[in-house]
Amino acid sequence: MKITDLKPKLVWECFDEITKVPRPTHHLDRMKDFLIGWAERHGLKYATDEVGNVVMYCPATPGYENAPTIVLQGHQDMVAEKRGDIEHDFLNDPIKTVVEGDWVRAEGTTLGADNGLGCASAMAVMIDPDLVHGPIEALFTVDEEQGLTGANGLDPAMISGRILLNLDSEEHGMIVIGCAGSMCTIATYPMEEVEAPEGFDWYEVHIDHLKGGHSGMEIHLGRGNANQLLARFLWLAEDEFGTIMLSDFQGGGLPNAIPREAKALVGIPAGNEEAFEKMAEIYSATIHDELRLAEGDTFIFNVAMREKPARMIAEEYVNPLVSTIFGTPNGVQGMSLAVPGLVETSSNLASVHKEGDDKVVITTHQRSSVDSKREEITDRITALYENIGCVVVTNDPSVGWAPNPDSKLLKTAEESFKDLFGYDPKVEALHAGLECGIFLEKMPGMDMISFGPTLKDIHSPNEKAYIPSVEEYWKFLTDLLARLAKQ
């Protein structure tokens, strides 16, 4: 079965078109061209701005021209993650989709349902002749996954509507009314390389096939962080053997993805092969036991002997680096006392990459619904890395979205959901970033909610969309549009 055989047919057909367009974050020229071409083919007016956002304008259903204009919003980009054994060029290759029971997934890569299904449903609304709706402005932003370039650079003159439906949530049955703010902290560790000496045996230490996932939506699940697990082992090895040498460390990827894989090239004093391999065996058993409930038994940790490298990080730089990575705050840092069950503050040790012969770059990603708490955890990490001589920079923080429980839009959405499905939706704030807070700053008075179909394991190659939820999400979206048009 192909995804174009699924219902609602228009949504899946539009999503199928989107999967054929390479669209990793920061590489969206093809997606912009696709959206413009799609609008032209369907006779829709459109506008773009300097950063690459696209807005399509769809007339109201006849008779509803005076209804309030509704903004349907999704983001163009997708997280580009793949399994290590998969050959895939995100800049040129289409996503290969697979229907598997009640789920749609990709072949070894992220699916891009985040936020391709949101974009596809906005497109489907504009070409479905059977729907009732007022004027529609469909806003497709760029670079939501990293940098929020689209939301921050949006020309608000392109948008006249003051009711916005953000289609970028991942749990059907939940209406989101607020989100956390976030920022990245990037530490550059200056170091020197020297010739690798004799007298050491060299090993590649590798951890892979962790679940990873979204560093906001899934940070509370206790999943392993590949960078920290690797640094922990290196720290233990240094403690056991007195000294270790380090030639390379590569781990993680995007700031908002929990790292699934990391590897290092490490030297230990010669003659300790048996002890080192036994230590690795014990460590593997330990972390498998620790992570059994969060990860299952599918991830791997192993060591394999390698040839002596020509160059390595000078010895005096190794201990400060390994100790600091190991000691970096990671995971949930505080729970909300105002909203039971909501993560208030977190940090993700997102990536560690030795670059060239003179530096290691460590990227962490902080989130909090309390600005001062986000600043506090950022300051702690900054102090930690500056203490070993790093140059630390932070990006501009993304704006959180304060909940408005008195929203008229929220009340209408709750009524629609209850009438359709017979139970009340969950109404929550998220420990994840959405563009809504920025929209509210740029377009004061905007009434907003966020919702979407059920997606699992986003930002990882295990990402999948629950097919039955897409149909129910579509019913909810179209019913809500009709109710808003008739108010």
Which residues does each PLM region occupy?
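Active-site metal-coordination/substrate-binding segment of hydrolases
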Residues: 64-146, 151-162, 335-336, 341-344, ...
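Zn-dependent metallopeptidase/amidohydrolase metal-coordination segment
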Residues: 7, 11, 337, 344-358, ...
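Active-site-adjacent substrate-binding region
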Residues: 218, 225-249, 391, 395, ...
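Acidic/His- and Gly-rich active-site-bordering loop/insert found
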Residues: 2-103
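His/Asp/Glu-rich mid-to-C-terminal helical/loop segments that flank catalytic regions of hydrolases
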Residues: 223-240, 269-273, 319-326, 333-337, ...
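Substrate-recognition/cap regions that form aromatic- and gly/pro-loop-enriched pockets
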Residues: 342-432
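Acidic, glycine-rich active-site loops and adjacent beta-strand->loop/helix elements
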Residues: 76-78, 110, 139-147, 168-172, ...
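Midchain, well-structured core segments that form catalytic/ion-binding scaffolds
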Residues: 102-105, 145-146, 151-367
